[in-house]
Amino acid sequence: MTDFPPSTRRRFLASSLAGAGALAGLSSFPSAFAADGRKTDTLRLTWGFTGLTFIAKERGELEKTLAKDGIKVEWIGPFPNHAPTLQAVTGGTADVSFGGSTTPALAAIIAGSPLVFTQFLVYDPRTTSIIAKPDSGIRTVKDLVGKSVAVNRSGLGEFLLVAALEKHGIDRSKVNVVYLNPPDAAPALASGKVDAWSMWSPGVDIARVEHNATDVFLEGRDLDFQIDFTSYLTRRRFAEDNPSLIRAFNAALKIEADWATANTKEAEHIAQAKAGYRDEVRDHLISLKRRYTLYPVTDQSFVTELQKATEWLVARKVLPEAVTVADHLARV
């Protein structure tokens, strides 16, 4: 596992700062917030082919809700996973990340990105899984020894692999960890360039249908604790300048979460129409009856749990150094 040397952190910032508005995002923060106001009526939201934000985008109601407050939504994307959206937000080409793993968000903050959490999301059941094709010879976690496993760096995939190996007493050095983003990992698994893949829905669900992949370690079944959560982030300066806008977005997304929880079948049909996966995948996702629960950054109990999770990740070098979550919360 990589220990994220300072040069890596500089590269992250260099790529992020290429976007417009980066200098404003990194300038000194004002001592007083733009009380109850906002300096823009436009909110640029990132999106990808998964998750609550994707469903909200395709449903089209979130824009209508925010329009009642005079807020115009612009969609930036698609993005393959959370980390690139964090770079877009850091660089100023987008305003809010699309709701992804807290782990790359924490890694970006450690690397120096001026990001703050605006809210958190927990979905249930947890469906992230380490999967392998039938011809891989992998049936159990112990079979991963000497094999290659694709994961997204400092993300949900890497966390699950680390947790699975630890639970079964396997040293990480005995597994060949291959860092790939989802668009590259899926064909790598299909072609046999990697032996297994640690991934979330719908990627794992598609692989089960198209390649007869099976679960080696399923988060909701095989792990009795949760370390990684879903999170939304913006630039610290943007939150300070636009507290009412962030509050309005949080409230609008709560409406979407409640709707998606109560209307699983319709939500999954909406997602499939854009993502284009098979009906078998859609029907499996419908059967999960996924529930979405949002937590505000003012929820001290949740923040405490996230801090414990952060320390777990630091101890296992998934994150390179300690970070205090409470120092990186939007004050809106």
Regions found by a protein language model. Give the residues of each.
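N-terminal secretory signal peptides
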Residues: M1-S7, R11, S16-L23
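Periplasmic-binding protein-like
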Residues: L121-A132, A213-F238, R291, A326-V332
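Cleavable N-terminal signal peptides
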Residues: G21, A32-F33
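Short, solvent-exposed loop/beta-turn-alpha elements that line the ligand-binding surface or hinge
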Residues: E63-I71, R221-D224, T293-F302
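Secondary-structure end/capping motifs
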Residues: E240-V318
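Short, glycine-/small- and polar/acidic-enriched structural segments
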Residues: A35-I170, N176-Y179, D195-S201, Q226
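Pocket-lining segment of extracytoplasmic ligand-binding domains
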Residues: T103, P183-A273
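Conserved C-terminal helix/tail region of periplasmic/extracytoplasmic solute-binding proteins
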Residues: T310-V332
